[in-house]
């Protein structure tokens, strides 16, 4: 996992050097933005789109590498994962710019036209690709692969079609719309509109959610309201640079960077379930931070955020995070490295900051899924007028197209390998969402005091002011006292308290724990 993080850090570190050069929008940037816009209109599939971002970035890199004596293509001319990309040579002009831009455009056009053929926006995706080609002055009917005469279009078509063929056998099951081939959930779905979680057979395993209406991350209303596990078999997809020493197999599952099993619950053993209850209990606790009117202000400037040091080992987890107040032991940074001056404080309501974080990683600027968020960030930085494009901040200025292509290659590889590793682990360990665990434990009761009502070893830990029992005089007791003795939590109150999404925030208050929701729309599968 450290190597994956290194790829991300490296791909971003080559960016953050300030200068005064003007930035041009390259053909690579144009096509990447076209891809991001198509992702925003597609089904919300982070795994699929990390792969799209990687394959398109690698194709652009390979074509650029052919123009440089010091560079080598990754796919073209090589056999990758048992798939051959035959190539010998190409006749470049003295200035290869025109041919290269043409080759990039045709390769991108072929790949995107194929990958978004079944997009939920129908023909609008293809219209977008056609329009981009037209704006660049290229003929979309040119499908020749005869690049022997130095045709950039033919070279792009050739590589684009090879990338399509490679993708049809890389383990993603693209030909069957990325459907799962062997995974099945052991639990019946949780119907979110109902209280509790009465049909959870195994409280350590993943559970589908049944929604009244399912609208995915990109705003598409899906014609079924109980979505499957997204990509639990993704560990079987060809990756870029994950060491084989990190590979694990068990039955049909392949996964990498094995972190070991998550915290589990034994419904009959409190002692062995401590970490399970603490982990999901912290989710409930931090959910109480989602009220912008609670008066809690925090500094979100670099003076207070970041510089947290080494991540904790498992046994140090609960000392690393602040269970009650939120946050980690970030020391912040004393000085701005550019100005040499301390950072100005940026005081904001904690409830605004926490909600923005949740909404960004769920929806991002325009719902291009988390892998796409990183490309949105990199495009913003790459286009900034103060960015001076030097490798690690030193040496000569790097050409805009070379800079974009190398940035995309590094970031695309990092996103794809991260997806292969992360979703492979998710699928293998098959762990449940917080909402499944919290509602399950709430329905069981509490595990704090066997002399008090609603005691059960599988129940929640009682915490004064945060997790308590409903008393007869409690507003949550119900008209007939039907909720007396149940568990209540002080938490975000949920979507029932949102009438106008533009203005309402629901706020934080006491709710029945069996009706707990994460901070999310009721039409979207929760984190």
Regions found by a protein language model. Name each.
Residues 23-527:
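Acidic/polar surface patches and capping/hinge elements
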